[in-house]
């Protein structure tokens, strides 16, 4: 009976169109990643490209395209206060400015900006736990920003006229 239930569940999942996201493909054979400022997003982009169809080029001369991280900043601001005037929530934000150009230096993606944010509650009784949660949320935002950049490159590449 359990085999029938498992087979039925598998059939329902495949019928709904569910599939795993898979590797982030850019449609490029090689991509060089550089950063004008210290950037954890650039590190995350390199990590996401490892093992995928797009190879990481050592320099822009050897690459089909170049991704430049122009700026990256994080911010933590008070979102809300309690009735006693104590911090209740913080807003964490990440801004990344980037540009993509081809091997000839022509812009494929004009300078663009991604801004991500998360709300985190604050607790005076567990400051170390909240600090760890904050770092985890920033890491998650960096990963999401890297994925968005690579997907944007893939969309622009897919919509580019054939040469």
List PLM regions with ranges.
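Bacterial signal peptide processing site
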Residues: 17-20
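Sec/Tat-exported extracytoplasmic proteins
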Residues: 49-53, 100-104, 124, 148-160
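Acidic/histidine-rich, surface-exposed loop or edge segments in extracytoplasmic proteins
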Residues: 25-32, 125-131
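C-terminal motif of bacterial Sec signal peptides marking the signal peptidase cleavage site
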Residues: 12-15
């Amino acid at each position: 009976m359990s085999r029938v239930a498992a087979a039925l569940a598998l059939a329902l999942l495949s019928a709904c169109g569910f599939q795993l996201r898979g590797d982030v493909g850019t449609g490029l054979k090689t991509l060089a990643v550089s950063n004008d400022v210290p950037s954890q997003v650039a590190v995350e982009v390199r990590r996401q490209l490892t093992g995928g169809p797009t190879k990481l080029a050592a320099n822009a001369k050897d690459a089909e395209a170049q991704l430049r991280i122009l700026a990256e900043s994080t911010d933590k601001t008070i979102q809300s206060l309690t009735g006693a005037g104590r911090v209740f929530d913080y807003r964490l934000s990440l801004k990344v400015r980037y540009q993509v150009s081809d091997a000839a230096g022509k812009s494929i993606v004009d300078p663009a900006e991604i801004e991500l944010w998360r709300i985190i509650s604050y607790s005076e009784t567990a400051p170390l736990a909240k600090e760890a949660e904050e770092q985890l949320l920033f890491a998650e935002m960096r990963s999401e920003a890297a994925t968005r950049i690579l997907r944007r490159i893939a969309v622009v590449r897919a919509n580019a006229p054939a040469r």
